[in-house]
């Protein structure tokens, strides 16, 4: 609602690169801007502090209302959701109806060298081919794990089958190039 949109600073919500593609489509439809950070609520909060934003969160459910807390807080999130439900006289399912969650497949592949695997021209070409095939109906994200020798390949598309196929296509190239630890 407009009352709640006006509470956003610069009409912006902070998310991570792993937030569902459907969330971004819903934000676009509602005229809400978003800032994307690396995965981790510490990066979400850092972006919020650096830019003065009030609302941010991760797909994992860590929702941060910077006016009330510095970390995700389930009780605050529940209270804020109830506040909106009461003000709009709508159920949670009615509020969430415009949000179409896209099927998502995320696979990890253990590699010898995360950076080399991700920067390889053939791997990049495979990723670009998937991105081109998806167009505006999905997305691909390939990123290094911050804690282990793993490259994460994530695809969101119209069907689970599409996601599986595209993720497997990219992983096949990583394996063909000899980066995978078998």
Per-region residue spans from a language model:
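Short, small-residue-biased leader/transition segments that mark boundaries at the very start
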Residues: 3-4
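Phosphate-binding and adjacent anionic-ligand microenvironments
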Residues: 8-182
